[in-house]
């Protein structure tokens, strides 16, 4: 069983690997579109970059701090998808001056993926320092808030639609120990994006912005290997969050604007919940359940 598969969920089917419905029949038209991914050089972010490249976007921009992983990601993407332009920006998402400059230099962006996150030491809350907590909130919440604001102020792309995809975590809603800063900051970030989503619905311009948060899955990384053996759980495939993000960027997901989702949830079952989602503003959001 997958690490979080036993958690309550709105769908019967729980995917640990990608599947044709989102990998081949996602409904997203990448023609002429530009995608900006923070943290897109490795891990989940790179999985998302590959999926959008496969979907035929014209340009993928990657923002991260380290040059070497960026160059490796660029080389891999251009080798596999020679028609896709890959642009690199070496910067920290916490730089509230540089990030708006990057948006200006890049031009209109169709899809913004908030993929950078800070994860502190896996220690009890009493052992985590104030600075570690601040670092988590500075990157996971404040930087996401500032970049979302800056993106909303940019001109609409030719497609007439902006999409913001926030890479969240199960830690935002599932009780996990030794994750005081990470879990609480991810929950706060999801709440921030929910506020943006509700306010965008009230804009008189027909809501040309769609906003989603989603848990990408559980992956066997070197950090995870310090606490679990590989055979202890069934780990998710990194292709899953990439293809799920592309599906979110397509037209079928519009009714899920402002919701907190999991890549593991079956998209056809989610579509079957459309009326409930539209009627219950709190359904699939981060908040108090009574």
Curated annotation (Swiss-Prot):
Enzyme class: oxidoreductase
Observed phenotype of the null mutant: Impairs the production of neosartorin but accumulates no metabolites related to the neosartorin pathway.
Functional pathway: Secondary metabolite biosynthesis
Keywords in alphabetical order: NADP, Oxidoreductase
Pfam families per the UniProt record, alphabetical: adh_short
Gene Ontology MF annotations: oxidoreductase activity
EC number of the protein: 1.1.1.-
Residue positions of the active site: 168 (proton donor), 182 (proton donor), 186 (lowers pka of active site tyr)
Binding site for NADP(+): 37, 149, 182, 186, 221
Lineage: superkingdom: Eukaryota
Regions annotated as coiled coil: none
PROSITE patterns (UniProt xref): ADH_SHORT
Function: Short chain dehydrogenase/reductase; part of the gene cluster that mediates the biosynthesis of the tetrahydroxanthone dimer neosartorin, which exhibits antibacterial activity. The two different monomeric units appear to be synthesized by the same set of enzymes, among which the Baeyer-Villiger monooxygenase nsrF is the key enzyme for the divergence of the biosynthetic routes. The pathway begins with the synthesis of atrochrysone thioester by the polyketide synthase nsrB.
Family membership: Belongs to the short-chain dehydrogenases/reductases (SDR) family.
Protein name: Short chain dehydrogenase/reductase nsrO
Species for this entry: Aspergillus novofumigatus (strain IBT 16806)
Gene: nsrO
């Amino acid at each position: 069983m997958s690490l979080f598969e036993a958690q309550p969920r709105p769908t019967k089917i729980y995917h640990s690997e990608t599947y044709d419905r989102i990998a081949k029949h996602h409904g997203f038209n990448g023609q002429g579109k530009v995608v900006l991914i923070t943290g897109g050089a490795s891990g989940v972010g790179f999985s998302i970059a590959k999926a959008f490249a496969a979907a035929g976007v014209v340009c993928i921009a990657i923002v991260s701090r380290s040059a070497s992983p960026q160059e490796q990601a660029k080389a891999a993407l251009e080798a596999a998808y020679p028609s896709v332009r890959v642009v690199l920006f070496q910067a920290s998402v916490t730089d509230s001056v540089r990030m708006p400059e990057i948006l200006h230099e890049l031009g209109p962006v169709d899809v913004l993926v908030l993929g950078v996150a800070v994860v502190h030491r896996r220690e009890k809350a009493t052992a985590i320092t104030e600075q570690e907590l601040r670092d988590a909130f500075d990157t996971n919440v404040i930087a996401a808030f500032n970049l979302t604001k800056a993106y909303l102020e940019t001109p609409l792309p030719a497609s007439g639609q902006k999409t913001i995809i926030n890479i969240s975590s199960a830690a935002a809603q599932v009780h996990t120990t030794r994750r005081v800063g990470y879990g609480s900051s991810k929950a706060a970030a999801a709440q921030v994006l929910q506020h943006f989503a509700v306010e965008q619905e009230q804009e008189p311009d027909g809501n040309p912005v769609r906003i989603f948060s989603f848990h990408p899955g559980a992956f066997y990384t070197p950090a995870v290997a310090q606490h679990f053996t590989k055979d202890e759980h069934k780990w998710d495939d990194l292709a899953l969050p990439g293809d799920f993000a592309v599906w979110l960027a397509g037209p079928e997901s519009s009714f899920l604007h402002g919701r907190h989702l999991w890549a593991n949830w079956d998209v056809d079952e989610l579509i079957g919940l459309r009326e409930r989602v539209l009627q219950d503003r709190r359904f699939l959001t981060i908040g108090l359940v009574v």
